[in-house]
Amino acid sequence: MAPWLELVFDVPLDKSFTYRACAAHAGEALVGRRVLAPFGARTLIGFVISESHSSPADCGGAVGTFKEIIRVIDREALFDQTHLACARWMAHFYLCALGQALCAVVPSRKRERTLSSFASCAGVRRTDTYALSGEQRKAIDAITASTGARSFYVHGVTGSGKTEVFLRAAEAVLARGKSVIYLVPEIALTHQVLQEVYVRFGSQAAVLHSALSGSQRLGEWRRIQCMRHCVVIGARSAIFAPLKRLGLVIMDEEHDSSYKSAHVPRYHARQVAMYRCADANCPFVMGSATPSVEAWYAMLRGAVRRLPLTARVAGGAPPRVEVVDVSKEALLLSTRLVDEIRKTKEAGYQSMLFLNRRGFSYSFQCRSCGYTLCCTQCAVPLTWHKRVGAMQCHYCGRQEAPPESCPCCHSFDTRYGGVGTEYIEEAVQALFPEYRIARVDTDALRSGHVQQTMEQFRAGKIDVLLGTQMIAKGFNFPTLRLVGIACADTGLHTPDFRAAERSFALMMQVAGRAGRYVDNGLVIIQTRNPAHPAVVCAQHGDCESFYAQELAQREALCFPPFVRLIRFVFRSKTRRKAKDAAYAAHALLTAQMPLGADVLGPAACVVAQVAGSYRMQILLRAPSFPVVQQVARSFLDEFRAPAGVYVESDVDPVNVL
């Protein structure tokens, strides 16, 4: 008789389902393969997690009530027991169903497609490797001499050679016959790292990232399974790569928030990497010039070993950093910054201007009645994008034509408030019409021009590069002298406990692009809050003082890393339903919370409406993770959301907006 199969599906049901295998596959091992199966009125892809020759009737079930699968999708197993164990851990830790976790782990498409992983790197040749500094050598020796699942942090100033440490450690691991996972925040923004990996490892390396189609990703997955690759580089999801004999996991730019998934399961690649390294009994190496506060605290406690790199490998002094108070400046670009852009060009060098807001203007405002044009589906102002001639919502993507008068009072006395990268681009072009200027932001990323623009800038074909936070990530430019941060205040006052941490990291990362190969590098930070600790510490490159102040404040206010948080968001198309569900949940949670733990909320999310859904949130807070996790699990088991209300759970949220 054909075996009985235990399946899980990508649905929010924390249970498995028993199906009959079709006769065509009788006798085949189906565990680890995907199948097409009827699920209620739908047909879904299921994951086979076990099989049995024992009839369900032996356990009291009626055989005739069990459905038969429609067909088997995979010729060979797509996942093994290692992946299944990881998915079980994720389901438990991140409060989701096993099928949802497994769906995040394995590729989703049915057919394979061949991909040349490093096609964009063709023709790149390896440059002569430079002599390692003493600090680099110590870091490499510490990593390669490690036995067991030890965590390290390569903490170095920008340009200190962290990538070389990672690559040399990877070479040593490969020489022992083991494999390596190399995580980066965003593949499209780390082309130089890709080139380094290509010239070091060639066909041994594979790329896994979100820009691959489902079929391309499946093809790469299969080749990794067949051991055609022993190095995998990629963004967040590359942590699940099916490598055999895993010997090292590297996480570059550990502080980057893109390592946290915004969708179920809302996993953080750092936590999954720690799990995989513990399972494989191998070292985990993180690195950044600006560690997350959690990572810094782990280093202070000795849970993670810090490996410092204090000097730039190209030599020379770090750039000089000036803070300009623009509270009395009439224009966005201060006189000081404009003068330095001109001097930099005259000296034959390049400039980079940073503003963490895309678009032309931030909002449409009426001077007569104070009306601000907002998205009808989201509780956020629409942003004016001059190039496409539309007001756009950066949450749901909705666009509409700009109004000629105030929609509320019909006044013509209106204005566009705030500025974005498009505005700066126009302003710089007006000031320097003869300069070659380019812009890099999310809009440019979608058009696929980022890599081309960055290569042109690196080749000296662009005089001034404008951009959002993506220009802060992993680029080296030989003749970049000046970096201007147009408005350091953009993220400082966001109602999120990580606001100062993010702003400090951005300022440090952007500043780190300046003067890597130029002796007189300069960074100009424009702000209306020159005394803010994040600005002061960024000006002096003083990480230790910033983290000390931030940790003291977090401890006083009972925020991570001194407590653990779990966030619940209740969303509904009806405001009243979302609110009622949140208050009902609050009553249930309050009754369950043990001594020392508390419930924050309910309250409307900072962004109270997204894509037409109203949002309320509750935060669970406790010094011990098992405590808060148990309360959250009990709550999810007991709470029954009303029709039309959806509950989202987020363990260790990176933002609370």
From Swiss-Prot:
It comes from the Bacteria. It is an enzyme of class 5 (isomerase). ATP binds at residues 156-163. Residues 390-570 form the Helicase C-terminal domain. Residues 143-309 form the Helicase ATP-binding domain. The keyword GTP-binding does not apply. Its EC number is 5.6.2.4. A motif (DEAH box) lies at residues 252-255. GO terms for molecular function: 3'-5' DNA helicase activity; ATP binding; ATP hydrolysis activity; DNA binding; zinc ion binding. Zn(2+) 1 binds at residues 366, 369, 406, 409. Binds 2 zinc ions per subunit. Belongs to the helicase family. PriA subfamily. Component of the replication restart primosome. Initiates the restart of stalled replication forks, which reloads the replicative helicase on sites other than the origin of replication. Recognizes and binds to abandoned replication forks and remodels them to uncover a helicase loading site. Promotes assembly of the primosome at these replication forks. This is Replication restart protein PriA. The gene is priA.
